[in-house]
From Swiss-Prot:
EC annotation from Swiss-Prot or TrEMBL: 2.8.1.-
SUPFAM superfamilies, per the entry: Adenine nucleotide alpha hydrolases-like (SSF52402)
A Pfam short name: ATP_bind_3
Record-level Gene Ontology MF annotations: 4 iron, 4 sulfur cluster binding; ATP binding; magnesium ion binding; sulfurtransferase activity; tRNA binding
UniProt pathway: tRNA modification
Motif range (PP-loop motif): 33-38
Entry protein name: tRNA-cytidine(32) 2-sulfurtransferase 2
Keyword RNA-binding set for record: yes
Major localization class: cytoplasm
């Protein structure tokens, strides 16, 4: 086991323990996009199941959105060699996106909604206890700043939440994992990564701008990324302007 994998194991098991993400006997569905993040999470979590750290039933779900150039042959081979239960489901969400999104606009919002809808549907149909997503430390801090700058809200990606209809529980075991470690791990493991030819080709994305902003600030103060993440668990309601929060404090 490499030093990088040990580091990933440490932060993933810490998040699972701190936020009570898994229970014995859980039937869980890990969403594998074909990118470095979900591949890294799968490899580590599978190892933790193999060495009996967690007693859970793992199923891997991949959504083939019918994008041009999609080739999952190597992904299938990887999953077969790993020996995990999996399904690659084909849904033509790409056609819907191309039809609905005006030329020049980014696809991310609609693509995300369609993908999320299929994930939730599949989880309910197969009676999954939990849905596992591969968002990491960097995703959380970028989402927080994006919410503040573009939506006027203080919110990000929680480690665990129940969907509005109460039907699905979503967990993110990599909230403490830094992207740079996942990049290194992907190189070490040589994962058969499938590039996204849809949103990956669009350069003017808000997330990329926010990511660069954080990187620039970190050049001046390396603690900036960790400080942003820590702020999500160090909230001072009395120092905010939310009337409902302030009223609840008074009462």
């Amino acid at each position: 086991m490499t030093k990088t994998e040990k580091k990933l194991r440490h932060y993933i098991t810490k998040a699972i323990a701190d936020y009570k993400l898994l229970d014995k006997g859980d039937k869980v569905m890990l969403c594998l996009s074909g990118g470095k993040d979900s591949f890294g999470l799968l490899k580590v979590l599978h190892g933790l199941i193999e060495d009996k750290t967690y007693d859970i039933d793992l199923h891997v779900y991949t959504l083939d959105q019918s994008q041009p150039g999609w080739d999952d042959s190597q992904l299938r081979k990887y999953l077969d060699d790993l020996g995990v239960s999996y399904e690659i489901e084909t849904k033509n969400t790409y056609g819907v996106i191309i039809d609905k999104v005006p030329e020049g606009k980014t696809y991310c919002s609609l693509c995300s909604r369609l993908r999320r809808g299929n994930i939730y549907r599949y989880a309910k149909e197969h009676k999954m206890d939990k849905i596992i997503l591969g968002h990491h430390h960097d995703d959380l801090i970028q989402s927080l700043l994006m919410s503040i700058l573009y939506q006027g809200q203080i919110k990000s990606m929680p480690p665990k939440f129940v969907t509005q209809d109460g039907e699905n529980t979503v967990i993110r075991p990599m909230v403490l994992v830094q992207e740079r470690d996942l990049i290194e791990f992907a190189k070490e493991e040589n994962f058969p990564i499938i590039p996204c030819n849809l949103c990956g080709s669009q350069e003017n994305l808000k997330r990329k701008k926010v990511k660069k902003l954080i990187q620039d600030l970190a050049l001046e103060n390396p603690k900036v990324p960790s400080n942003i993440l820590n702020s999500l668990s160090n909230v001072l309601p009395s120092h905010l302007m939310d009337k409902n929060l302030l009223n609840s404090l008074e009462n």
